[in-house]
Structure formats: C-alpha cells, structure tokens
From Swiss-Prot:
InterPro entries: Rbsml_uS13_C, Ribosomal_uS13, Ribosomal_uS13-like_H2TH, Ribosomal_uS13_bac-type, Ribosomal_uS13_CS. Disulfide bonds: none annotated. This is Small ribosomal subunit protein uS13. Located at the top of the head of the 30S subunit, it contacts several helices of the 16S rRNA. In the 70S ribosome it contacts the 23S rRNA (bridge B1a) and protein L5 of the 50S subunit (bridge B1b), connecting the 2 subunits; these bridges are implicated in subunit movement. Contacts the tRNAs in the A and P-sites. It comes from Flavobacterium johnsoniae (strain ATCC 17061 / DSM 2064 / JCM 8514 / BCRC 14874 / CCUG 350202 / NBRC 14942 / NCIMB 11054 / UW101). GO terms for biological process: translation. Part of the 30S ribosomal subunit. Forms a loose heterodimer with protein S19. Forms two bridges to the 50S subunit in the 70S ribosome.
Length: 124
C-alpha cells in the first residue's frame, strides 16, 4: 500500500481512482498528476515502483490537499460568519445557503425533526 500525502492509497485499484482517495484530488487532477509523473493511468498501484511513487509525490506536492485544504475551507466559512454576510448567517444557523426552500425539505442541514405539541390538546 503506497502512502502519498499522509493517505494510504488502496493498492488493488487503478492509479487515477486511487489518487482520488486524497482529499482535494478529483479524477481530472489525478490524471494530470499521473501525466506529470509519466505513469500510465491504467497501471494499478501495486505495480508502481519506488521511482514512480516518488515522482507522484513530487507532482502532488504542488497542490493544496488534505489538512491544508480542509483548514482553508474552514477558515473561509469562519470568515463568512465573522463578517456577517448572508451566507455566513445561514452557516451559523445551520440552514441551506444557496436559495433552497426550507418549508418542506432541507432535512440534511436542519437535522432531525423537532416535534411541536398538538395545538388542539394545548388549548383545552
């Protein structure tokens, strides 16, 4: 099992798919990295030799990935919350940001339903 950028990459998968296990690398960027490192896209990770792994590590080091990318994203969200813009307020209150309706759906953002007492029983 190869270890690139602190992530154990599955050895039985093709190189392109295996590199997508790294946070911040999608399929297109994985293809780009393999081309820079001059490694075949169809080659499985278990067939990579040490020179190829080293070349891939060098190519990956130019990108913001894993912890560095996660911290940047969280700092961006924190900045939005601090300046008090619309998106920041929606982040703070745990609601959808991009104009979706919230009357019926958005259960993922709002969490589990909170039941309200029955109005008929409450008035008696």
């Amino acid at each position: 099992m190869a270890r690139i950028a602190g992530v154990d990459i599955p050895k039985n998968k093709r190189g392109v798919i295996a590199l997508t296990y790294i946070f911040g690398l999608g399929k297109s960027r994985a293809i780009e990295i393999l081309e820079k490192a001059q490694v075949s896209q169809d080659k499985k990770v278990q067939d990579w030799n040490d020179d190829e792994i080293g070349a891939i590590r060098d190519a990956v080091s130019f990108y913001k990935i894993e912890g560095e990318l996660r911290s940047e994203v969280s700092l961006n969200i924190k900045r939005l919350m601090d300046i008090g813009c619309y998106r920041g307020i929606r982040h703070r209150s745990g609601l959808p940001l991009r104009g979706q309706r919230t009357k019926n759906n958005s259960r993922t953002r709002k969490g589990k339903r909170k039941t309200v007492a029955n109005k008929k029983k409450a008035t008696k």
